[in-house]
Regions:
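Bacterial N-terminal signal peptides
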Residues: 4-16
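Sequence context surrounding c-type heme c attachment/ligation sites in exported
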Residues: 23-172
Length: 172
């Protein structure tokens, strides 16, 4: 019985190995082509997020994390969140260069440029008063932009509580 079992496994392994051996194409075999993808996969690959998507997914969480880091006086995390916010804003302008015939990067700079520079200075100096004012100005810039673009119903504010239960904002 044991011999039959061993022979059965050996035969299965041999068949499996033979099945995995690649065939050598002949000179007359046409090359394999991959058909164009259709359906959900190709749609996902061609998806370009809109300005609203990018603001919601990239900018808003980083704005909140920056505020939460400041509330805990975690200057290292505030510096990191600030850089992430800078990159997120730049990404929005790169992914969506135009919105309703407006240059997105220029809009962002005009509404947030000065407060972002002030935030950078405040973080470097660990100046809580300067940070608080610059963060308020940044938040106001966001809301001014929303209003100017007829989206005044989107109101950004300083976070009251964290939406990130798995992240500690207190300095280690």
């Amino acid at each position: 019985m044991r011999t039959a079992w061993v022979l059965g496994i050996a035969a299965a392994l041999a068949v499996g190995a033979a099945a995995q051996t690649p065939e050598t194409p002949s000179a007359t075999t046409p090359p394999a082509t991959t058909p164009p993808q259709r359906g959900p996969v190709s749609s996902a690959l061609n998806y370009v997020p809109g300005v609203g998507d990018l603001m919601h997914l990239l900018v808003q969480p980083r704005h909140a994390k920056l505020g939460l880091a400041f509330q805990e006086k975690n200057w290292a995390l505030a510096g990191y969140a600030f850089k992430e916010l800078q990159q997120a804003l730049a990404t929005v302008g790169k992914v969506q260069p135009k919105w309703r015939n407006l240059t997105v990067a220029e809009m962002i700079e005009s509404m947030t440029g000065e407060p972002m520079r002030d935030l950078d200075e405040a973080i470097q100096a660990k100046n809580a008063k300067q940070f608080a004012q610059a963060y308020e100005d940044l938040t106001g810039g966001c809301n001014s932009c929303h209003t100017a673009l007829n989206h005044g119903f989107i109101v950004i504010k300083t976070p009251d509580v964290s939406a990130f239960p798995n992240q500690e904002f207190k300095a280690p």
